[in-house]
């Protein structure tokens, strides 16, 4: 069992979906704390997200689930139900971890008795720019 499960509910975002998901994967690859698995609950109707996951299958331990329903919040629940890590971090396909030690910081707090934490974002992303 991993320390962390990274739960990522996804849906159809056209060509941007896999692009943004790969950016998230790249931010996870450089984390100083690497004891995590990734759970993808994919609500899209095509294989673009699945193909992006396959590209990173040598880098990460994945659980991939195709969610056929049409309720976005249930897609999050599907991802959460598949998590096996001691700590669950929900991320969305257009999120990234900016700090390379983000998971390490969360893990240290967990080890110090923290039972619940949340994180925020520092900007928004459009098709060509990151706004901080």
Located regions from the model:
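Short, well-formed alpha-helical segments that are part of the catalytic scaffolds
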Residues: 13-30
């Amino acid at each position: 069992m991993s320390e962390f499960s990274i739960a990522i509910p996804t849906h159809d975002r056209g060509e941007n979906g896999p692009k943004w998901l790969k950016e998230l994967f790249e931010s996870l690859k450089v984390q100083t704390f690497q004891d995590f698995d990734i759970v993808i609950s994919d609500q899209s109707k095509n294989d673009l997200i699945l193909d992006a996951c396959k590209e990173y299958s040598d880098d990460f331990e994945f659980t991939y689930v195709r969610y056929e329903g049409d309720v976005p919040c249930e897609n999050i629940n599907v991802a959460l139900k598949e998590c096996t890590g001691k700590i669950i971090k929900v991320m969305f396909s257009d999120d990234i971890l900016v700090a390379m030690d983000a998971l390490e910081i969360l893990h240290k707090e967990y080890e110090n008795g923290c039972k619940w934490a949340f994180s925020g974002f520092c900007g928004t992303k459009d098709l060509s720019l990151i706004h901080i």
